[in-house]
Amino acid sequence: MQAIKCVVVGDGAVGKTCLLISYTTNAFPGEYIPTVFDNYSANVMVDGKPINLGLWDTAGQEDYDRLRPLSYPQTDVFLICFSIISPSSYENVSGKWGPEVFHHAPNVPIILVGTKMDMREDKETQDRLKEKKLYPVSYEQGLLKMKEINAFKYLECSALTQKGLKTVFDEAIRSVINPPVKKSKSKSGCNIL
């Protein structure tokens, strides 16, 4: 059985722990308790291959900026998460999380994950954001951010309804077992005759 280490990063309160608990236990946790570090494990079949998926939950809070990278060595794939209803967490994907991951693990695939997709159409949430002249992050914005940080894929999910949840982890595994073919840069230069 192939073992894959998947580390989940992103701002505090974007839903990283809920994502992992909902995926591994099929239950949505009730209250928010900030994570320092937690590990989860799941044995799954993807494309007919048995996989032991080691899931590393990290703290998004700035207090842990020096501690968090200790979980990065030997990572096979990163999930960089932002909340669809938190534009600031979306901006931090390229402002903080992408650069942090690239610095510590430059050649490891990244899946960009928009969490809380069930809240995008929630009227109360929309009104709260509008009061601050903000809007939920669109799917198209997610695709743009994926290209900006050179992620393998952009996916959205809801830990509450489990919509898109299994796909996130299946695609994370696929990014490791079927890595994307790197485009070789053609060498342009001049020929001296």
UniProtKB/Swiss-Prot annotation:
Cysteine methyl ester modified-residue sites: C190
Residues given in the record as GTP binding sites: 11-17, 57-61, 115-118
Signal peptide: none
Alphabetized SUPFAM superfamilies for the sequence: P-loop containing nucleoside triphosphate hydrolases (SSF52540)
Compartments in which it is found: Cell membrane
Protein keywords: Cell membrane, GTP-binding, Lipoprotein, Membrane, Methylation, Nucleotide-binding, Prenylation
Motif Effector region: where in chain: 32-40
UniProt keyword Nucleotide-binding, yes or no: yes
Lipidation (S-geranylgeranyl cysteine): C190
Pfam families, per database record: Ras (PF00071)
Mode of membrane association: Lipid-anchor
Main location, first listed in the record: membrane
GO molecular function: GTP binding; GTPase activity; protein kinase binding
Propeptide residue interval(s): 191-193
Subunit (UniProt): Interacts with pakB. Interacts (in GTP-bound form) with rgaA.
Entry-linked NCBIfam families: small_GTP
PANTHER family recorded: RHO FAMILY GTPASE
Role played: Overexpression promotes the formation of filopodia and membrane ruffles.
Protein's recorded name: Rho-related protein rac1C
Originating organism: Dictyostelium discoideum (Social amoeba)
